[in-house]
Amino acid sequence: MTTQPATPTALDGLWEPVRIGSVQALNRIYLPAHQVSLPPPAYGAYLAERARGGVGLIVTHGFHVHPASARAGVSPWEPAWADAVRAFVTPSKRLGVPVIVQVTHMGASGTRRTDDIAHWGAVLAPSQLASPVHRAMPQPMEEDDIRAVIEGFAATCANVQAGGGDGVEIHGSHGYLLSNFLSLIHISEPTRQEAI
């Protein structure tokens, strides 16, 4: 019995490998960032199941780069967080699927419970304009705050690299801090130009 070769389809290209910078994805199907609240080993198992299911590239949910955006006691800017990264990226990488880690600062879209304020401090944003969704009143950022957030992005990205992540995706939409700085609603034009 002979088998006939499969008839080519318009979707065949989806299964071809693709290079994005230095990252080689197995195919053109990727798992986008979405929130899953699991500890690192369980999150790693969750992502690996998606790798087994056929995705060629994984983007994790967002990890916060600074205390003013932090939640749930996770401190990605601290060097010890590299071990957590290793725990959730390694299972997928063993299957040949690269993992990109999303990093973010929520800015005016941040939320705070009373215990969060005591532990992490106030929500920070370019101006004192609350998000229409979360309604937490942000504290306007000073230059030192901006510098600290930049350092938080750098430290978190370094931890991703140290933990074996294949890259980072910076999330700046949805009213988060980076989009706050680009919005004329949140800041004046001279301030926006200084920020850029």
Protein language model features and the residues they cover:
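Active-site-adjacent beta->alpha loops and helix N-cap segments on the catalytic face
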Residues: 137, 182-183
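Short beta-strand segments at enzyme active-site cores
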Residues: 58-61, 99-103, 163-177
